[in-house]
Amino acid sequence: MVKVGILGAAGYTGGELIRLLINHPEAEIVFANSESNAGNLVAEVHEGLYGETDLKFTAEMPFDQVDVIFFCFGHGKSEAFLKEHNVPENVKIIDLAQDFRLAPETVVVTQQPTPAAHDFVYGLPEINESKIAVAQHVANPGCFATCIQLGLLPAAKMGLINSDVSVNAITGSTGAGQKPGATTHFSWRNNNM
């Protein structure tokens, strides 16, 4: 049984992860961390889990009781968390945010700075299964990257892609997480393409 800790468990990603893990035969959720919801039932925040679990959010982070922790923070918070907290080396980390998705040597101009150095392995099993299997730190790819890579991978393996590929992708309102922003509110995104 893999013992799991979830940080940032009250957000959309945390809720979906809890939903996937509560009935997983090989996983046990030891803690679901959310400082703002500590003491509340998970199902009070993630209403779709009502009747599925009696798990409560906690402000505690007992790393010594888990085998793996999932970072379900907003983008840009995972790196800061690792700088501020001492996670034992034997605890695996799977980051579901964007902080460690790109290799340190990748030069990308974005609104979010890429960490200067890290040892996270790109976590798309269809292309990186052997490295993920032995990795201590895994960076889960984003929804667009996953969709594009899984869609193109069969054609690429068969040598059918002979030129650049252009992708037009559209995201829903939940793609930016729960925290409101000027361009992420439903009223801004609704019927706005």
Predicted ranges, named:
Residues 2-193:
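N-terminal Rossmann-like NAD(P) cofactor-binding subdomain of oxidoreductases
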